[in-house]
Structure formats: C-alpha cells, structure tokens
C-alpha cells in the first residue's frame, strides 16, 4: 500500500468517526499528492456540501466533475480508436451528462455514432458542434456530408489544410497499419503497366503529396520530382524524406495552371476524394502536362450518377463520370480498373484507378 493510499484510508476513518476537520485536511493532502484521486475528491466535496468542511461547494464539485470527465473521456477515446463504438457512446454521453459543454465529448460522440452507423445521431452531434463553432471548417463540411444543406463541389482549402495538419505526425502509421492503405502502390503498379519502367527522365508532379508515400515509389523515375500540398505540416514530413526537388504549399488546380507544359507525369493518390466536380482539376492537369503526358489518380468508387459527398466527408465518383470528365478535359483513358484502396471500420473502401493521356 502506498503512502497516499494509507493517507486516504486514514482520512476515511477520521470522517466516519466524526473528525471532519482532520479528515478534510488529509483528503486535501491526498489530492495534492494525487490530483486525480476521484474518491478523495468526492469525499471532500460531500463534506464541503454538508458543511462539515470549509470551502466552496461549487468549486469542490467541479473538481469531481473534471476528474470524472477526464477519466471517462480517456476510456471513450480508447474505445473509439479500437472500434468499440458502443462503449465510446456510453462514455461520451456520461460526460455530457456531467458537463454538457465538454466540446471534445460532443465531437467524440458524433464520431462514435458515425462509426456505429447511426447517421441521424451523428448528424445531430456534428450539428451541435457546428452551431457552437460556426467557423469550424471540418464540422461544417461533415454536416454537409451527412446531408444537411447544399453539397459543395469540393472541400474547402481550410478544411483540407486543418484536417491534414491535425494528424500529420501520425499519418503514415494510421494509413499503413490501421487502414492497410494501398493507393500509392496501386498507382505505381498502374504506371508500370502503361509503360513507365524506364528509370529517370520524367518531370513528375506528386499532387497532394502528403508525407511523400507516393514520392518514394516515383523518385526512381524522376529527373525532377515536385510535390504540392495544402498542409504545411505534411510538407515538413515530406521534406524530411529528402526525395523532392521542390515542395509547394498551394492549391492543386492553381499550382498546375501556373506551370503549363512542365510535367511528363502527374500522380494523385487519394486526392480527388476531397474534390467532387473534377472538371477544374482535370483541365488544370491538361495545362500542366507536356504533349502526351500522363495523369494517374484514384477516386473512391460509387454506383450513382456523377459524384457524391459521403458521410465520411470524402467524395466518391462513378467511374463513368471520371471517364466523361477526362474526355471533356482533353484526355483519353489508357487503362482504368477498380480495386480496394484501404480498409475503414473493418470494411473495404472500393476505388477506381485511371491512367489518362493528354491528347
């Protein structure tokens, strides 16, 4: 038994024997040594509320609430990460019963409800968060993704930037270990399939380069390798790989329009899932490519007409829409196929990969 445990037991015995002043003093010592000791905080709060110890009852009760919410939030977050959505939902609801303004619990409950496929409740809590923070780009985007309000033609630059800045440090681990992320490898395979085996000699743009996962595969084919991304935190990690000749913090279509006829190859792994209407991006890619240049990219596939903003906050496209849009932009499809891009919530995410040549 630790010294603090002995101190707590002694305080409890003193409280039972009616020695409230001495007991309260010891409970306070316990909390000084161990600020998150819930039992000591509860005992002291009860004594203060009953008038058996000095102090502000509201402040004493707040200490209890803070300890309970923090502890419960930790359990809820762990449950959410491991796909125990039922446990996470119970935890977040318990927190909000104690503190209705606990913002992280509101967001966590929205995420857990979405993971549990309760889209109505997910929308309710994302909307609650968005109403509290109307300038939060992610909340506003997801509310739209869940079907409330008009569907934007693309995710805002601010949303994309904030989303990827927030988990840049853990990006590679999450994608490769948790989600079995395959898009860069699939794009590399498609490149080799269309005759891109020759090492060196290509001016390549890694569009939405992120941390450089695609760049690792394509460096061997590049006389120059340029990466572009909206997230400065992702670009820092890409720079650390030492594989890029240039890294640009720019919006993709703007970047490509500003560099006419500069690239032999443009690759974009899981980039157009943040763009619904592909016309502007494909037109810009056509401008940036040299005559006969190739663009290879992936989209999340869906059977409905055109494109749709899904509840995940990402866009999915019908392959026929991709082919039609590329033809209008001045491309011919060399090859296209469906494959699994990654695993999410235990389910495969089906995608469409295409290699287009400028004509």
Annotated model-derived regions:
Residues 297-315:
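Short, glycine-/aromatic-enriched active-site segment of Class I SAM-dependent methyltransferases
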Residues 257-266:
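A short acidic, Gly/Pro-enriched loop at the edge of an enzyme's catalytic core
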Residues 205, 210-255:
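Class I SAM-dependent methyltransferase SAM/SAH-binding core
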Residues 279-291:
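A short glycine-rich, Lys/Arg-flanked "PGG" loop and its adjoining helix->strand segment in the class I
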